[in-house]
Amino acid sequence: LKFISKKLINQKDKIIIQELIFKPKISGVIFSSDINNDSPYYIINFDRSGKTNLITSGKKNSSMQTIVIYKETKNLGIFHKLINVIKKFEIIFKDKVLDVEFAVKNNKIYIFQCRNLKKIKINNNDTIKENLINLKKKIIKLKKKNPYLCGETTYFSNMSDWNPAEILGNKPKPLGISLYKELITNSVWAQQRAEYGYKDVRPNHLLINLAGSPYIDLRTDLNSFLPANINQTIQRKLINFFLKNLKRNKSLHDKIEFEVIPTIFDADFEKKIKNTLSINEKIEYKKQLKIITNNILDKKNDILNKEVNKLNKLEKKILQLKKSNLSEIQNIYFLIEECKKNGTLPFAGLARCAFISNSIIKSFVNKNILDEKDKLNFYESFFNISNFINKNLLKIKKGGSKKIFFNKLGHLRPLTYSIESKNYQENFSTYFKDFKFSKNKGRKKFILNNKKEIAINKFFKKNSFKISAKSFFAFAKKSTQLREYSKLIFTKCINEIFINLCSLGKEMNINRKDMEFVTINKLIESYSNLNNSKLKKIFNKEITDNKKNHKILYKIKLPDFIENHKDLYFHKLINVNGNFITNKKIHGKIYEIKLEKKIANLNNKVVLIENADPGYDFIFSHNIKGLITKYGGPNSHMAIRCMELGLPAVIGIGENNYNSLSNSTFLEIDCDLKKVNVIT
């Protein structure tokens, strides 16, 4: 110390020696505001391991937790003393975002350091407070009993069905969320389920907009998976049981069809309902699920071809509208109506068929009728969209025309519901620059041996299913391929809607970026108003209002799963393990794709993406090593795509884990052990 003191330039400088805090109860870092957007929340990253450097080291650990606390809440739980200390720092460093390292031992707070990170730009805390009060009222209202539905209450999830967080993002612009609701979650999803034998829950909407974030109403969702012909007593028992299960196990909210509610009859039926029903009630429930499953699988019903016929009609209608002399607003109106009738409706049906196939195969693996390798070989055995992309890119590389590629895939865009995102045709050189193909792109052979075929046929016969093992796998293959095909067709409609919107915006001197703030509802309302000067006034007002509102809503932080209004003010981020695809082990350098930034060379990288819709399929033309997504379930687009390609992936790793990994450089994915290890 004498040596150090002699080296001090200013003799008034002090050396502060801090006592070593050995094995604290908790330790971590607290931010006085969200560093990304200055939103008024305390964000506490901590763990209970007894180590004081685990959080700051950046290493991922299962003991780590993140708590988000709205600044004006009085419910601070065990953190009230810590928050009071931070508030004293905030008085000293006014309007600054602070990063404070701390530990708690024997009920004492120890501050290791406090760093001033940046100045808070805009303070709109009063408006945020008002929005939270209104949101609280909305949630209390929505949780009350619903005469159309069974269930004493409801909860909200951003990933339980139709994956809105994965497809739209956490805070989508008004155009995207309103278009998604109109095309799918207002009524189309419920119509499709009712047509397949499930309970008709209309007029209830599936997706609820909570402070600009898309959430699925879980009571509505669970009711829509009940067979239409089971009695009210069974319905009530089941829905209340499933809701309680989700409340206890929030991490299951993105995999409810696999882990919570049986939506078809498969080999896993018993484990999902446990002792909820009496013997007779269980028999009735099982019987009705078998009827639904059998009707879908039975060749006589020809469900797959019926859905494809609708898609063929849609393609013809799109071409007709392209050639018409209708105004942009008329085209948009007709495209929306056609897409609902012959686009998203058959897509929903084909997605249900593909899910049923996947669920039955997964249940066979769980019952050891098949093994994991059989499942992976099956999904890697047939031609898919990624194969088509790579095949055509190879032709283009050799000097071939891009016409075939653009005709089939040119309309796709990352973030399907964002007009601001450029499609493959507009941005080909960015998405497919330096494309390289994996050396191992050959399709696997799926061979079902005699013993396994007999076991599967025995299961089908025992449960009176009118299908054989061979016919089932043919159905599974066709339904999976047609689901992907149907995405390609109905997203053409979305692309045409955006083309017409851009053209309309150009006439009105409204740019593409601003068009994100026009709602589809306003466009439909304007169908009868063909005067562009009036439309311009209407749109400009909506754009101004929605921009202002979006800036406020963007700062409101909500959890992935909302149990009640208290979660608006104080919530813990759910630690999820993610859905591991394949049983491979890889390690590689991390590259996070952000569309607002230039995309670098992806070759041999482990790619991180927040969203995971079909428009991101371009990444598979770059010989990537692995994939990690923030959002996504076991049956989501990227999960299926990675399974088809045999690509190691972790789908839906959650906000907490994703943020930790995005700050890392090199990692290892062990799909067999279901682990992600940060190396540097």
Locations of regions flagged by a protein language model:
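Active-site nucleotide/adenylate-binding loops and adjacent lid/helix of ATP-dependent enzymes
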Residues: L1-K12
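Conserved divalent-metal-coordinating catalytic cores
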Residues: K12, K23-R443, K537-V606, E610-K625, ...
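Short catalytic/ligand-gating loop segments at beta-alpha or beta-beta junctions
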Residues: I15
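Core catalytic machinery and nucleic-acid-binding channels of phosphodiester-processing enzymes
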Residues: Q18-F22, K88-F89, T519, L523
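Extended, domain-scale alpha-helical bundle/helix-rich regions
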Residues: I360-K367, F446-K557
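A short, small-residue-rich loop immediately preceding and capping a beta-strand
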Residues: G626-K630
